[in-house]
């Protein structure tokens, strides 16, 4: 990580992967983070990255339903967010983050039901997935050897089919992808 000044970090990653005998295109990613306030450890982060994904062996060959004609997914993702961390050593620690993201993916692989009663993957020409993710983690010391840990997250993730209809009866263009939840939340303790 390059730090042009003490509170700012910049990272550039260039990645290429081999899948069988085929190489991915170069997959760049740029990450920037900056400390806004040392009190509360408030940090702003942003990134831009290229996405590329080969179909999995299940996508291609699962029986029944695999689709050996699938194309590779590719696209770009942008995100930005804030994080914080506060606490008192040996007493408690609270961490949280809020992140906005925006992805434009071509040939998104989605498993859909068939008329034969099983699911099969298909490529969705253009998908726009965007939203926010909120995370929080709390640790509280209850006694000398006891600690309570709670963490949770909430995601709002519209994933919209912006491609072309796959058939004359396809009414999914402009709508949320099926089997991809728009809202999700978890709490663990």
How would you name each of these model-derived features?
Residues 1-39:
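Signature of Gram-negative outer-membrane beta-barrel scaffolds
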Residues 3-9, 95-104, 123-189:
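Gram-negative outer-membrane beta-barrel transporters
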Residues 12-14, 26-30, 66-68, 76-80, ...:
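Hydrophobic, lipid-facing positions within transmembrane beta-strands of outer-membrane proteins
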Residues 13-18, 62-68, 117-124, 168-176:
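Extracellular loop and loop/strand-boundary signature of outer-membrane beta-barrel proteins
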Residues 14-20, 48-54, 61-63, 86, ...:
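Transmembrane beta-strands of outer-membrane beta-barrel pores
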Residues 22-26, 92-93, 146-148:
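Short glycine/proline-enriched turns and hinge-like loops at secondary-structure junctions
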Residues 22-28, 57-63, 107-117, 157-171:
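Outer-membrane beta-barrel translocator domains and adjoining extracellular loop/strand segments
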Residues 35-37, 43-45, 72-143:
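Membrane-embedded beta-barrel scaffold of Gram-negative outer-membrane proteins
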């Amino acid at each position: 990580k390059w730090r042009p000044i003490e509170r700012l970090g910049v990272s550039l990653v260039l990645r290429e992967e081999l899948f069988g005998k085929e190489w991915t295109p170069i997959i760049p990613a740029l990450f920037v983070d900056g400390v806004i306030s040392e009190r509360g450890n408030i940090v702003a982060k942003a990134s831009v990255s290229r996405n590329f994904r080969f179909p999995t062996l299940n996508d291609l060959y699962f029986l029944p339903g695999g689709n050996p004609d699938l194309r590779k997914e590719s696209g770009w993702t942008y995100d930005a967010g804030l994080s914080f961390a506060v606490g008192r050593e040996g007493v408690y620690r609270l961490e949280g983050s809020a992140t906005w993201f925006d992805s434009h993916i071509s040939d998104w692989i989605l498993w859909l039901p068939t008329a034969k009663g099983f699911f099969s993957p298909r490529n969705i020409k253009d998908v726009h997935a965007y939203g926010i993710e909120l995370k929080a983690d709390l640790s509280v010391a209850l006694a000398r050897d006891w600690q309570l840990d709670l963490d949770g997250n909430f995601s709002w993730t519209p994933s919209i089919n912006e491609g072309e209809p796959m058939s004359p009866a396809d009414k999914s263009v402009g709508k949320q992808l099926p089997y991809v939840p728009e809202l999700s939340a978890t709490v663990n303790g």
